[in-house]
From Swiss-Prot:
Localization in the cell: Cytoplasm
Ligand binding (substrate): 142-146, 175, 188, 192, 282
Keyword terms of this UniProt record: Acyltransferase, Cytoplasm, Iron, Metal-binding, Transferase, tRNA processing
Naturally occurring in which organism (per UniProt): Bdellovibrio bacteriovorus (strain ATCC 15356 / DSM 50701 / NCIMB 9529 / HD100)
Name listed for the protein in its UniProt record: tRNA N6-adenosine threonylcarbamoyltransferase
GO molecular function: iron ion binding; N(6)-L-threonylcarbamoyladenine synthase activity
Gene behind this protein: tsaD
């Protein structure tokens, strides 16, 4: 029986390793950030990301075992992200997992990165545990640099996509605006920080599809509007009004996300909702979502920051659950830039 796994996450630019029980208990989770390596380029360079994963991964595995005070005899399997993500980055994690699987005579399983985000609220450690009454079913909004989607989660492997962005992801929109405004990388964090000193009503930005009777979203118009606004103001005025610009731009994104989450919770009569993914670390989104949930009487779960951003703990939890019911991957498993058709309904 699979009780505990070593987990590897290398889908984008963060290298992460964790040791996780199928109960969701995280014995250790460690990570190596590449922000400084990509900052000078204003975004993620896939080849650099893959190269850095290959350098960081083995030392992180050793660190994860040391931090958990465990060794290879304490795990019964290996979970690794194999989709979706940057192909070069995924290959590093996948090849490492396969090699360790063969060397240590342990089964391994490829895990969908997005499924990890959807089940991240169930993770627990010395400082975090989900509410006692939290469980299936629930509505989840997964928001990151590459994905912005609404789901209905009924159980392990039982996920329904309700809606998604038709173009740019919310995280991508934050990053592009930050780059155009000269804030650098990572953009979402910089906009969030700058916005705290600004007025969210100072500038008017579009909120596409906010009143649409679907769960879909669109952020490309907002990105274009942000570019036009910056060009119209000019460099000097942009710098002078940067806090207001960031606050107003951020508010437009948050308004759309909250509106779609509210619609989904109403339509599916869900009293339990989650925010997950890297953008759920945004302080304004967290504040607005909590205010909304308190007003509506919903149970809102937002994992702590360490489990919102890309991390191996969520991959390990999904992997441990699936391997405990007999699922394993073959050695010919490959990486995929997209989720599989069978992953979601």
């Amino acid at each position: 029986m699979i009780e505990r796994v070593l987990a590897i996450e290398t889908s984008c630019d963060d290298t992460s390793v964790a040791i996780v029980d199928r109960t969701g208990w995280v014995h250790s989770v460690v990570a190596a950030s590449q922000d400084l390596d990509h900052e000078i380029y204003g975004g993620i360079v896939p080849e650099i990301a893959a190269r850095n994963h290959s350098i960081a991964l083995i030392p992180l595995i050793e660190e994860a075992f040391k931090k958990a005070n465990m060794n290879w005899s304490d795990v019964q399997g290996i979970a690794v992200t194999n989709r979706p993500g940057l192909i070069g980055a995924l290959i590093v994690g996948l090849v490492t997992a396969k090699s360790l699987s063969q060397a240590k005579h342990l089964p391994f399983l490829g895990v969908n990165h997005l499924e990890g985000h959807l089940l991240a609220p169930f993770l627990r450690d010395d400082k975090y545990a989900p509410p006692e009454d939290f469980g299936y079913p629930y509505v989840g909004l997964a928001i990151s640099g590459g994905h912005t989607s609404l789901y209905q989660i009924k159980g392990l492997g039982d996920y329904r996509i309700l809606g998604a962005t038709k173009d740019d992801a919310a995280g991508e929109c934050f990053d592009k605006f930050a780059k155009m405004a000269g804030l650098g990388f990572p953009g979402g964090v910089r906009v969030d920080q700058m916005a705290k000193a600004g007025n969210p009503q100072a500038f008017e930005f579009p909120r596409s599809m906010i009143h649409d009777d679907t769960f879909d979203m669109s952020f490309s118009g907002l990105k274009s509007s942000g570019q036009r606004m910056l060009e119209q103001l000019g460099p000097e005025l942009v710098q002078e009004r940067l806090p207001d610009l960031c606050a107003s731009f951020q508010e437009a994104i948050v308004d759309v996300l909250i509106a779609k989450l509210d619609r989904a919770a109403k339509v599916f009569r869900s009293k339990r909702v989650i925010l997950t993914g890297g953008v759920s670390a945004n302080s304004r989104l967290r504040q607005r979502a909590q205010e909304w949930a308190d007003k509506k009487g919903y149970t809102l779960v937002i994992p702590p920051l360490r489990y919102c951003t890309d991390n191996a703990a969520m991959i390990g939890y999904v992997g441990a659950l699936r391997m405990a019911r007999g699922e394993v991957s073959a050695l010919d498993l490959g990486p995929s830039p997209q989720a599989l058709a069978s992953d979601f309904k």
